[in-house]
């Protein structure tokens, strides 16, 4: 098997009505944990890398690690995705280092803190789409800002997130504007704002439609039935791992994530990519704390890392099964990026929108 573009993978997911978890990765242990789970489930994989992860691990290290994972797990279609690119250069250097997909997040300006207007977002996302598609790479765009409908605030992730408070209209993607944005930019996938946020502290109570606007996804899918929708900030923050974390010296306050059943509902309405980072961080940190608390003389890093890897793998397996990803790796025949570039050039991959009905 080879590296796969996001577009081909999500096209396959749409044809077979499943979703694909996109796990953030910073190091070898995360990579191995995710890929072991994928092998066990026969699931295709999206490994995504933030700008913070690229700074932490270095592009050369990450590129070589991805090469190693590709060789070690030859039967798993592997999409390597830039998460929350803040400018054209971030996206193009990712492609230069072997990424098959990039996200141009033009919902914020280049400082990754200031909300951008529609014109800026459409302009810069269109430019990234034009350049990436020339070499066959996929592009994800974002419309609307990721943040809490309870508070109006967003949670910065690796330095990416708006400052201050926004009103509800800025925190929810408008379906008509989404149709216009996809048509203008030519993106392969669209991240939408529905009240989710980065980090562990997403909701102060089990979310309802008041703070988790799944109906927005349904309306966008109605306008854009062939567009792949992306849910960001979609960790479920499992209670069992919160309990382990706190039982062994942690001080995590009560919080609620995005329920898995709501994500599964979203998959029925066009959600194809589901971003997950906090769940793996929490599982790994909880496993670390348990070893540190119960084996206080232990100092071999491997004795901490192996349980952390097992914990992360368990979360990944659960998501592959719940989202219907399991069983699909062996059904995919990877299309090379050069062929994807030819298809983009021919216009055969141009997005289509359903016209809005007159009032």
Curated annotation (Swiss-Prot):
- InterPro entries to which the protein is assigned, alphabetical: Aldolase_TIM, Class_II_FBP_aldolase, FBA_II, Fruct_bisP_Calv
Positions annotated as active site in the UniProt record: 83 (proton donor)
Main enzyme class: lyase
Residues bound to D-glyceraldehyde 3-phosphate = 50
Q: Which domain of life is it from?
A: Bacteria
Cite the entry's keywords alphabetically. Calvin cycle, Glycolysis, Lyase, Metal-binding, Plasmid, Zinc
* UniProt binding sites for dihydroxyacetone phosphate: 199, 233-235, 275-278
Q: Which SUPFAM superfamilies match?
A: Aldolase
Q: Look up keyword RNA-binding and say if it applies.
A: no
**Enzyme Commission number(s) of this protein:** 4.1.2.13
What does the Swiss-Prot or TrEMBL cofactor note state?
Binds 2 Zn(2+) ions per subunit. One is catalytic and the other provides a structural contribution.
What lineage is on file?
Bacteria, Pseudomonadati, Pseudomonadota, Alphaproteobacteria, Hyphomicrobiales
Q: Which gene underlies this protein? A: cbbA
Recorded protein name is Fructose-bisphosphate aldolase
- Record-listed Zn(2+) 1 binding positions: 84, 198, 232
Q: Which PROSITE patterns match?
A: ALDOLASE_CLASS_II_1, ALDOLASE_CLASS_II_2
One GO biological process term: reductive pentose-phosphate cycle
